[in-house]
């Protein structure tokens, strides 16, 4: 967090509505996208966004460290989104249509690279895949796996921060990331978006 944003957070914590409004303007777009990727519903995402910021202001005294503002805000949003999704559990599939084309830059293969941020087996997505195809693949993941992928690769939170956001142990987050990457890789390979090991001529044993 830069010093300017930290100063705004400190002012907001002191009750400044002007600072709160500025934080809303600077953060709402990214938070809305996050809510949309979790729910796949624009109306729900707008409601989740509004509820997140209402809670942010009402419970601002619970934020002890200004530099922790973003993970704290994601915690509110993710848990609110999960609650909404649990209420609508009967819905069988999510639609991810209609996100702005500019999302493509945010949805590249770096989401699904290895922990060390080196180019992993899904690196071909960077050149070969579109945002829409990746969104479709993500929509097929269970919500808990989709969420950790988004928080880690898209929002660039650490596994420790994600643990705080999701209310789980850091080891659980790492396990979910590993499984999510494996599942996502399988989906992309099954749809011929990236090559599997057999197609690349790789064999084991």
Residue locations for each model-derived region?
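Short helix-capping/turn signature of helix-turn-helix
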Residues: 26-29, 37-38, 141, 150-157
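Amphipathic alpha-helical segment used for protein-protein interaction
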Residues: 5, 10, 14-17, 89, ...
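Arg/Lys-rich amphipathic alpha helix in sigma70-family domain 2
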Residues: 58-65, 78-96, 104-105, 127, ...
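DNA-recognition helix of helix-turn-helix
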Residues: 78-82, 134, 145, 154, ...
